[in-house]
Amino acid sequence: MQKLKQQVFEANMELPRYGLVTFTWGNVSAIDRERGLVVIKPSGVAYETMKADDMVVVDMSGNVVEGEYRPSSDTATHLELYRRYPSLGGIVHTHSTHATAWAQAGLAIPALGTTHADYFFGDIPCTRGLSKEEVQGEYELNTGKVIIETLGDAEPLHTPGIVVYQHGPFAWGKDAHDAVHNAVVMEEVAKMAWIARSINPQLNHIDSFLMNKHFMRKHGPNAYYGQK
């Protein structure tokens, strides 16, 4: 697990590097599906002092199997998503400014241009709000459930992120670094959408044929973007 702990540590350290977190407001995890174990950031530990050995290993029920610290308070959300979507290898949660603003506004981040379409096939959805009972019960688990309720049976890697109403963004990917990459992109397109709609409040969504082209040339069966 040491290799995965190092990867998760490095991915967590990318969050302050890209300006996605303030203080300790974020976490990254990754899963070893063969072993059924998840590595995640410890709760409330400052990035300035954090080390790879501080990462916490939990099983799929949330029991700590390795580590001196308590795991992130959002662990139950991560585990619920891993259980539901086998294609996920890494998950990120932040309170990055612009994506969180859309979450607090209760609005999906609209697909307005090709930067968005290169990574997200359509709007980045916003969940419904959690009920009082859901918050006072198993809050973090129910956060995962409301994300799943919103995504349904859609392929999560085609829309590798979501904003949870009145909370903030979650992003995911094939591994921890891919998840962070998608979280960075989500923050950037959230900022672009806010600026674009401020300039032109009547701005329409990107044309579907242009969105399809940009997404499929990177992620489709005949993708040709980048190098083999």
From Swiss-Prot:
<feature type="active site" description="Proton donor/acceptor">
    <location>
        <position position="225"/>
    </location>
</feature>
<feature type="active site" description="Proton donor/acceptor">
    <location>
        <position position="118"/>
    </location>
</feature>
<dbReference type="GO" id="GO:0008742">
    <property type="term" value="F:L-ribulose-phosphate 4-epimerase activity"/>
</dbReference>
<protein>
    <recommendedName>
        <fullName>L-ribulose-5-phosphate 4-epimerase UlaF</fullName>
        <ecNumber>5.1.3.4</ecNumber>
    </recommendedName>
</protein>
<feature type="binding site">
    <location>
        <begin position="72"/>
        <end position="73"/>
    </location>
    <ligand>
        <name>substrate</name>
    </ligand>
</feature>
<dbReference type="GO" id="GO:0016832">
    <property type="term" value="F:aldehyde-lyase activity"/>
</dbReference>
<dbReference type="Pfam" id="PF00596">
    <property type="entry name" value="Aldolase_II"/>
</dbReference>
<feature type="binding site">
    <location>
        <position position="95"/>
    </location>
    <ligand>
        <name>Zn(2+)</name>
    </ligand>
</feature>
<keyword id="KW-0413">Isomerase</keyword>
<dbReference type="InterPro" id="IPR050197">
    <property type="entry name" value="Aldolase_class_II_sugar_metab"/>
</dbReference>
<feature type="binding site">
    <location>
        <position position="167"/>
    </location>
    <ligand>
        <name>Zn(2+)</name>
    </ligand>
</feature>
<comment type="similarity">
    <text>Belongs to the aldolase class II family. AraD/FucA subfamily.</text>
</comment>
<dbReference type="InterPro" id="IPR036409">
    <property type="entry name" value="Aldolase_II/adducin_N_sf"/>
</dbReference>
<dbReference type="GO" id="GO:0005829">
    <property type="term" value="C:cytosol"/>
</dbReference>
<keyword id="KW-0862">Zinc</keyword>
<comment type="function">
    <text>Catalyzes the isomerization of L-ribulose 5-phosphate to D-xylulose 5-phosphate. Is involved in the anaerobic L-ascorbate utilization.</text>
</comment>
<dbReference type="InterPro" id="IPR023499">
    <property type="entry name" value="UlaF"/>
</dbReference>
<comment type="pathway">
    <text>Cofactor degradation; L-ascorbate degradation; D-xylulose 5-phosphate from L-ascorbate: step 4/4.</text>
</comment>
<dbReference type="GO" id="GO:0008270">
    <property type="term" value="F:zinc ion binding"/>
</dbReference>
<feature type="binding site">
    <location>
        <begin position="26"/>
        <end position="27"/>
    </location>
    <ligand>
        <name>substrate</name>
    </ligand>
</feature>
<keyword id="KW-0119">Carbohydrate metabolism</keyword>
<keyword id="KW-0479">Metal-binding</keyword>
<dbReference type="GO" id="GO:0019854">
    <property type="term" value="P:L-ascorbic acid catabolic process"/>
</dbReference>
<feature type="binding site">
    <location>
        <begin position="43"/>
        <end position="44"/>
    </location>
    <ligand>
        <name>substrate</name>
    </ligand>
</feature>
<feature type="binding site">
    <location>
        <position position="74"/>
    </location>
    <ligand>
        <name>Zn(2+)</name>
    </ligand>
</feature>
<feature type="binding site">
    <location>
        <position position="93"/>
    </location>
    <ligand>
        <name>Zn(2+)</name>
    </ligand>
</feature>
<dbReference type="InterPro" id="IPR001303">
    <property type="entry name" value="Aldolase_II/adducin_N"/>
</dbReference>
<dbReference type="GO" id="GO:0019323">
    <property type="term" value="P:pentose catabolic process"/>
</dbReference>
